[in-house]
């Protein structure tokens, strides 16, 4: 910043730039100095400290001044310093120096860079120059300055980077790459892009044209691991084996304990050892042959005990597999993949490709590479009532094997028998046809149904007194099985499903069943009928039924049972039709009176008997059962459970008539019962009187015993009660006492705390009041003393001012004036008093008579003159009283 002062004092080691405005040339003035500025000069800035470069430091000056051989600054013809424009000058430690006009301190004072051991500076030449040894350096040359040492910077040299040495430890290698043609530190020539490894343990400082790619760790090999490698190019490995591009091989612990992958080796992974136990084997695909190449498409079976590494290109077909150890109930189904001979020398059997055969245990079997294990078979244990469906794959024939343990042969497979969905559902429900027939289907449908094994023989347990029909579609014949029995279906057999009516009234196809119950049983139906007088009624009838089978061994007889699929609906419809026809011909009153007989006759019908009426006609006799010849169903009885009119008016009329009949019957029964009761009462009364006397005697005895027991019981009870009450009261008293003591103690503590607090409060209040009262009294006493002193002083000063004679005159002036006033009035005596002074009037009479109190005339006393106490009240010398307070009583002669 320019300064306008004329005298500039320049301290030591300071400088200024002075501009000559006439010649427009600047020069430097260095202190210590007092510079007097001329009018044509201008100081460009205040004195500035010189640039001081301490030891082991440097700075960079741009546009430096030119110097001669002796180091003196050169000037041009105008007196301006000569500058090397666009040039740099690095100045090391020296005496403080000023900056000439035009010089710029481009880089401030900077410590010299110290190159530590195991480090180097990567230097690059920016300009051509000769070093201190006289060697020519061309622009673009690169070299390293290795430590330890101090780097002296040059303007022609650029520091590219600082290179650190890489520490190579045991089982490590340094991977390098040449950036251009060079010689490595071992004296080998390297071409651009070439890579190599340095395995020497220690610190390695890469050369200038060497690029560090990474630090490669050695792979530690054990007995259980191997290293899988692949060649990137043709080279010779550490064992001296020539490798071709793409070739793969393994390195195991037998080759080396720790392997550092070469730059031409690609690590594909670590291969674990494959260990086979005594009961293991494996199948190797594409095994390596004696020539070291993979035999594509070939297989090799290896059986344990053995440990090996899978060579490159080899793989296990299904991993490590267990040897097939077969027991007596196990077998293996095998298939030949290639022609082979199986068995020992004498029992060799030739198999063609695709042949299937079964081997049975007990034995250990390892399949060869030419054999495929189709499946492992187990003998299927079967009870007497269990079975399986077996199909011959060659003939296609299906048969059922029941009752013995069976193992499938090589030509047999398990066959699945399909059942209709309805039959499948009925079998999976597991309901008892007899015990669970009244339960709802939804009660068990919520439970998940276990899937049926379709290869097992379908069996069904026929309950007692029931029948199941099985139809063979191949033989086209049916068979009926009566329970209790277990029926098993053949491969071509199916159950006959019954679709029965159910509900009230009956609904068709409401229930399905596999077995037919033979009864006896009952079913209930609700039907609507109409009488001859058009009264509509609703009947609920229950029928007892059973099936009548004369010969269960006769196929035609047993087939009749299943001839009607819905025997319930068919029977209910037939019986309802008969009942409607019979009721339609009678009136409501007749049906109401004879409903059971009419319905029974309609259901069972009549049969002709030999009995005749008086007219000689045969009398019909009602039957006791109804038989349905189609299926042998027999209805043995009918129960009329309810009869309800459908019409509301008919229902009300019927209800009234029923109530009236009930009342009549009730009244007659009541009268008969009352008469019988009176008779029985008379008889019982006599017995009662006799019994009463006997009972009284017994009662007295019992009362005596009762009183004794009561007394004893009361004594025991009172003792126990008293004891319990005493204990409870004592316990209650103890608890109450403890509570009272604790409460009193707490109250006493609280009262003591309150009393102590109140006492302290009152004490402090009294102390403060006492201090206050004492202060007030002291103030009052002081005030009274001061007032008294003031009054005394005032009175003294007044008396001194007035004088004794004046005071006497003032005291006497009043009474004398009053006396003179009274004398002027002619009054002989006066009395002046107030209300508080008593007046003695006993001598008033003497005054009225003109006599004194002693009986002397007043004239004498007046003539002699009044005494000082007469005629004037003692209060006359006092101050004048207020009007009305004193009474003047004149005394007249």
Swiss-Prot record:
Keywords: Acetylation, Cytoplasm, Isopeptide bond, Nucleus, Phosphoprotein, Repeat, Ribonucleoprotein, Ubl conjugation. The modification N-acetylalanine is found at residue 2. Phosphorylated on Tyr residues after EGF stimulation. It comes from the Eukaryota. The keyword Iron-sulfur does not apply. MVP repeats lie at residues 2-56, 57-111, 112-164, 165-217, 218-272, 273-323, 324-379, 380-457, 458-520. This is Major vault protein. It holds the Pfam family Vault. Gene3D superfamilies: 2.30.30.560, 2.30.30.570, 2.30.30.620, 6.10.250.720, 6.20.380.10, Band 7 domain, Major Vault Protein repeat. GO terms for cellular component: cytoplasm; nucleus; ribonucleoprotein complex.
